[in-house]
Amino acid sequence: MPDGWRKMGVLVFYDLPVVSPEQRLAAVRFHKFLLADGFERMHYSIYARYCGSMERAATYERRVEQALPAVGHVNLLKLTDRQMVGMRKWIRGNYRAPENAEFVPPAQYQLF
């Protein structure tokens, strides 16, 4: 199997209810778990992590499963290195980050 098919990345998408204080706390805890576990926030509820191998991707899949809140919708998508490289990001127009948002430089990844 070619190398680019063995190296993996993981995307986590979630939609969690935040109606009650307990649900908000669970959503915040899940968000903080993902950041502490090395995931990079790509969008409001989309997080990505480069894993390097299928085995490590499976490890992070188990870790996310163990951290799931009691209520909500969470998807995990495993992508090959070649699929991750094909991802594109555009920010257009007069987009500005909120005033209270702090800039966090992206993590440096070693891809090869």
Curated annotation (Swiss-Prot):
Domain of life: Bacteria
Entry cofactors: Mg(2+)
InterPro entries, sorted: CRISPR_associated_Cas2, Virulence_VapD/CRISPR_Cas2
Annotated positions binding Mg(2+): D15
Record's keyword terms, sorted: Antiviral defense, Endonuclease, Hydrolase, Magnesium, Metal-binding, Nuclease
GO annotation terms (biological process): defense response to virus; maintenance of CRISPR repeat elements
Keyword Ribonucleoprotein appears in the UniProt entry: no
EC number: 3.1.-.-
GO molecular function: metal ion binding; RNA endonuclease activity
Transmembrane segments: none
Coiled-coil boundaries: none
Entry keyword annotation includes Metal-binding: yes
Protein family membership: Belongs to the CRISPR-associated endoribonuclease Cas2 protein family.
Assembly and binders: Homodimer, forms a heterotetramer with a Cas1 homodimer.
Record's function text: CRISPR (clustered regularly interspaced short palindromic repeat), is an adaptive immune system that provides protection against mobile genetic elements (viruses, transposable elements and conjugative plasmids). CRISPR clusters contain sequences complementary to antecedent mobile elements and target invading nucleic acids. CRISPR clusters are transcribed and processed into CRISPR RNA (crRNA). Functions as a ssRNA-specific endoribonuclease. Involved in the integration of spacer DNA into the CRISPR cassette.
Designated name of the protein: CRISPR-associated endoribonuclease Cas2 2
